[in-house]
Amino acid sequence: NGVPIDAVVADFMSGAIEELCPANDSKHWDIIEGQGSLFHPSFAGVSLGLLHGSQPDAFILCHEPTRTKMRGVETLLPSLDLCIEENIRLGRLTNPNIHCAGIALNTSVMSTDPKKLKDEISAKYNLPCVDPLKDDLAEIISTLKNIK
């Protein structure tokens, strides 16, 4: 099941996602994928609708480290700190227990070895940091499995 969220009237986005993500037992996961950002002026409404409607226990923050501006606009990218803080702050409106469970980096266009950057980010946030297209996901999966 799914919802083509871009085709849903804004007033009903959260409800459409909530309908797909009812409270489940601890052995069931709903994976909600969104490509927007709470900070992108063109997509923030959709991102917030997904966040509120899905009421996640955890989220994986996705980032492309060589990008300085958001795609299609001149808006600068916010820091990872601010992205994590705002996703948690706004997510707490529908799930007070939300937290960041990891960081996924798209390192495909990096000209340097991404290992150092991933290690630095992981140490700074005390979270797993991986490129999901290149790295083992065991650490992030383990973090998700340990959600109470």
Regions found by a protein language model. Give the residues of each.
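Flexible phosphate-sensing "switch/lid" loops adjacent to ATP/NTP-binding sites
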Residues: 1-148
